[in-house]
Amino acid sequence: MDDDLKSIASKYYIGGHISVSGGLHLAPERASIFGFRTFQFFSKNQMRWNSTPISEEEALRFISEVSSHSISSTMVHASYLINLASSSNELHQKSFNAFVEEIQRAERIDATFLTFHPGSNGNKDEGIRKIKEAIEKVETHKVKLLVENTAGQGNVIGSTIYEIGQIIDGFDSSVGVCIDTCHAWAAGYDITNKYDEFIDELDSAIGLDRIYAFHLNDAMKDLGSNIDRHELIGRGKIGEGLIKLISDVRLFGKPKIMETPYGEAKFEENLKYIRKKLGE
């Protein structure tokens, strides 16, 4: 990939979700191909409860590769199966155990962030309480725990900025937020036409200082559809709103992770669109 595109990724702290096929230690080099200084990955199969432990050798190789490729932050995405909000005591406990394991795995490889979905519960207040209780029960952790906003499908918690703010309220800076732009759009936040209102609401309900990262995704479906379908940047319904976010000086230094269709195969296309719209 040409150096101009790499410089865009580096300058605006844009990264992407990277495959760990063949081993965790291969991910940093894959990220560096695009000029990424940050990237996201799964440390285990995201659709299974069980996992193979990360060996000390594998952890050290990963940490060494992160350093040698000048990666400044890494984000683990937790399993999709985890539902800390569940009204089922059995599922809640199983989810909590998996959550703790995810934290331990992230810390073993010196990951900067662990992002997780809030989960679902027909009773929002109960769900939020159970999520907060789970976070409180976690022993001291050095990896930052990031709650991700949701698209608003079914009984899923966290589609409103206010709910995300409720979840992190009362915790110190080791707990923060990752805002997914596609999810926000699907939940009814008009990032394109009402960008400043969106940022103002993030600041008032959460605090920009507690938003540590973004998932930079365009949206395939309409505003307020509650349908979570990511699209390539510039090919979806959000479009220019993402450029506003990327170039917003208030958000500089916060990782912006692409989770777009076709993964690494289309990151270059995303970056070309971004470069064109930025005029660089």
From Swiss-Prot:
GO terms for biological process: base-excision repair. Zn(2+) 3 binds at residues 183, 228, 230. Its EC number is 3.1.21.2. Keywords: DNA damage, DNA repair, Endonuclease, Hydrolase, Metal-binding, Nuclease, Zinc. Its cofactor is Zn(2+). One of its GO terms (molecular function) is DNA binding. It is an enzyme of class 3 (hydrolase). Zn(2+) 2 binds at residues 148, 180, 215, 259. Binds 3 Zn(2+) ions. It holds the Pfam family AP_endonuc_2. It catalyses: Endonucleolytic cleavage to 5'-phosphooligonucleotide end-products. Zn(2+) 1 binds at residues 77, 117, 148. Endonuclease IV plays a role in DNA repair. It cleaves phosphodiester bonds at apurinic or apyrimidinic (AP) sites, generating a 3'-hydroxyl group and a 5'-terminal sugar phosphate. Belongs to the AP endonuclease 2 family. PANTHER family: APURINIC-APYRIMIDINIC ENDONUCLEASE, ENDONUCLEASE IV ENDODEOXYRIBONUCLEASE IV. This is Probable endonuclease 4. It comes from Thermoplasma volcanium (strain ATCC 51530 / DSM 4299 / JCM 9571 / NBRC 15438 / GSS1).
